[in-house]
Curated annotation (Swiss-Prot):
GO terms for cellular component: cytoplasm. Belongs to the prokaryotic/mitochondrial release factor family. This is Peptide chain release factor 1. Residues 283-293 have a biased composition (Basic and acidic residues). It comes from the Bacteria. The keyword Cytoplasm applies. One of its GO terms (molecular function) is translation release factor activity, codon specific. Keywords: Cytoplasm, Methylation, Protein biosynthesis. Its main location: cytoplasm. The keyword Cytoplasm applies. It is found in: Cytoplasm. Pfam families: PCRF, RF-1. Methylated by PrmC. Methylation increases the termination efficiency of RF1. It comes from Finegoldia magna (strain ATCC 29328 / DSM 20472 / WAL 2508) (Peptostreptococcus magnus).
Amino acid sequence: MFENLDSVVDKFKDLEVKVADPEVIADMENWTKLMKEHADLEPVVNKYLSYKDNLKNLEEDKELLGTTGDSEMEELLKDEISTLEEQIEKDQEELKILLLPKDPNDEKNVFIEIRAGAGGDEAGLFAGELLRMYQMYSDKKHWTTEIMDIQQQGVGGIKEVVMMVKGKGAYSRLKYESGVHRVQRVPQTESSGRIHTSTATVAVLPEAEDVDVKIEQKDLRIDVFRASGNGGQCVNTTDSAVRITHIPTGLVVTCQDEKSQIKNKDKAMKVLKSRLYDLMEEEKNKDRADARKSQVGTGDRSERIRTYNFPQGRITDHRINKTIFQLQNFLDGDIEEMIDDLTSYDQAEKLKMMN
């Protein structure tokens, strides 16, 4: 089934020799590229070699079975054959997953954009709780976070926020968070005890590199203005806030979180590049209906993906029909279990398509 992987093993061994060659190491750019290729192949090669060892051991055990003349040894061989057959089946499934086409964005940093939706002040409070949840999850993963821009709303609420998350595999873990998140609870201001429903929209964008997106200066309109705080009052006496409009697409990015205009412009450009990259990917995906079906949900940000029900203390992800009854822990960043299940579901759907 995996015979063509022998050539992958040969390539891996060849790479091992190359990355240890002093002449190759001297060319840092080429060496880094080869090291990445080596690291990408290593999990597949290790699993394949383990799989081949198990196949060889199984064949040897089957040849021995019935020839030892020792009943105790025969029973041991039967047990070992059963264990090896189970392991080989597991190896095959793991190899299939390792051979699935990789998302080229998986290892990238991300921008998480959270916007309050329907529900007024409650929606703003919920958007703030989602921001905190992703910050705490990132801390647990030893990733770094940086607020690129934030617009506050009401008391402690957020109208809109853009946060950058830097860390290995950030996009691979957070990409399933895109969509509409719904909260059901009794607001503190609700005297009758009636449950209100509010929403917040989350968009997760991979950080675009210069090679991904080329932006012509003539396509940009850059406006500067004084940063405003909660309620619209000016919080800065200089024109430090920056608004960048990409004229061909109409995309607008505003950044006023820093006191420096230069820093705000730099942050705004990073976000703009990622939004343009996301737009380009979206256009490509319009021609890939089958690929869209293989994703968890549709990837549409208008899709309701998850409900946070406070009275029942539960979180339900509607894409995989999974419910967790540890709401506060979840909001404190313990979302790994849900992400693992979403990843497994996504892989299973892609395997179905391959088969």
